[in-house]
Each structure stands twice: as C-alpha cells, then as structure tokens.
C-alpha cells in the first residue's frame, strides 16, 4: 500500500482526538440553565453534564407536598441535562464534522 506524502491518517486521528479533548475541557466551562414550575426550581448544568447548582424558591417548599418539589427538581435537572447534551453535541460536531471514528470516544460526552 502506497501512501501519498503529507497524508498520515494516524496523525490526523491524533490531532482530532487532541482537539476533542480540548473541547471537552472547554465544555466544562460552558453552562446552560433550566427551570421548572415557572422558575421555582432552577438548575445550572455544564457541558460535561455535571449539575453545578440547584436553586429552590421558598414558596415551593411545602412539607405537606414534598412530592411536588421532588417532581420539579427532577424536571429541571432533566431539562438541564438535555440542554447540556445538545450544546455538547453541537460544539463537538464543529470539530468532528460528522465523522464516526471507531475508538474516538470522549468520556461523559454521549
């Protein structure tokens, strides 16, 4: 098999892996916000799908109805994670350009 000069597929894969690893680090710094219950519960999630904060308005804290608060927290967190995944996929897509390279997996991305 003859390879043309200047084309080294392994070098290109390594460069792509390096770019994606840098992007993963950048995603840790990017955040999305999500809320439920008209803003009564709000969460901040980073691009690595890590929940950074949860805020609960005092008005929604009812000792007689804990289930409602739990449902609002779950809804806000799930919405935040979905938004974070969409953001991460969009950012990574800029680098990968839709490539599907076997073995090129970035932990915590998908």
Swiss-Prot record:
Presence of keyword Cytoplasm: yes
Family annotation (Pfam families): YbaB_DNA_bd
Keyword Endoplasmic reticulum (UniProt): no
GO molecular function: DNA binding
Record's keyword terms, sorted: Cytoplasm, DNA-binding
Location of this chain's protein in the cell: Cytoplasm, Nucleoid
InterPro entries: YbaB-like_sf, YbaB/EbfC
GO cellular component: bacterial nucleoid; cytosol
Family statement drawn from the similarity comment of this UniProt entry: Belongs to the YbaB/EbfC family.
Subunit structure: Homodimer.
Function: Binds to DNA and alters its conformation. May be involved in regulation of gene expression, nucleoid organization and DNA protection.
Protein name from the UniProt record: Nucleoid-associated protein Sfum_2790
